[in-house]
């Protein structure tokens, strides 16, 4: 493990209805920005007429980020390496620093935007409280992004924080096992196992049970010739509604809970945390009903750890290989809450969800290599 730079972001998204004049201004901006994007992408000189139109119709605080390549917020850095978009006119955002002299700023609990005319978006009380807490954590940069989505104005306040982190020498070890068939298991270790917590995503509970029943019923009726296409569509809509909803909120709430606990336990033990994250290989995740939820969890979790400057590392921590001799483990017994694994070579026995902790201790040299 080596010193590295971690970048974390926090985003507050606000939406509001606006009049046609504001939406027309955004669309006009997107046409100009798209022309400059394609000129940059294709390595050709932008049209003088478009540059003149940009100067006349777009204020400088929105304009420089699509024209000046030396601008720190230049939108088109490294676009040559990105996938080529299918659309000619892109939904490019207006971007600027969050400041009273710029295109957007906060005043009296409102986000004030200068979009050809003044636009005020009231920030809900809970969102404003959250934003003030994040601002108190001293982000390095504060920016605002503005774009149109389905006829509504979307504004995102983006806070950015960069931390230089080094691996702690005597850490509070936190092992996060992303399990392709269960969910998330978290171990806290400081010389001994402090606690183990398990988090199961909501889409592994009654929702999937109900969806499977609906799909089985639909397929049986279809095979008997009892369903028209219209009825099949109704069943499909019921299945989608059954599975809709809460995976994103589960990810955010679970990550926030785990990070709060990491910081609290680390403070109580007077140690810096080291978080090792075990992500299953793509083959074990592919086709899993948990795939999207777990990968979203990992991405959001690493982002929040980076925001707080907590050292994390993705590590392969085995659950089917014996940490004592390196042989393959066999399932000895399965209960409602645990799977007991045993090594026929050396006799090692442990709950499967705890085996990654042994490999984490091997990685930081608190246990010998098998």
Language model regions located:
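A contiguous, well-ordered beta/alpha segment that forms the leading edge of an enzyme domain
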Residues: 2-66
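Positively charged, helix-rich recognition surfaces that bind polyanionic ligands
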Residues: 3-16, 25-29, 155-370
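Generic structural motif
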Residues: 17-21, 95-97, 116-118, 126, ...
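Exposed regions on extracellular, virion, or secretory-pathway luminal proteins
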Residues: 19-21, 70, 131, 135-139, ...
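Intrinsic disorder/low-complexity detector
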Residues: 21, 70-73, 93, 118, ...
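Acidic, low-complexity intrinsically disordered regions
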Residues: 34, 58-60, 126, 204, ...
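Short glycine-/small-residue-rich flexible loop motifs, especially phosphate/cofactor-binding loops
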Residues: 36, 73, 302
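Acidic carboxylate diad motif detector
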Residues: 41-152, 295
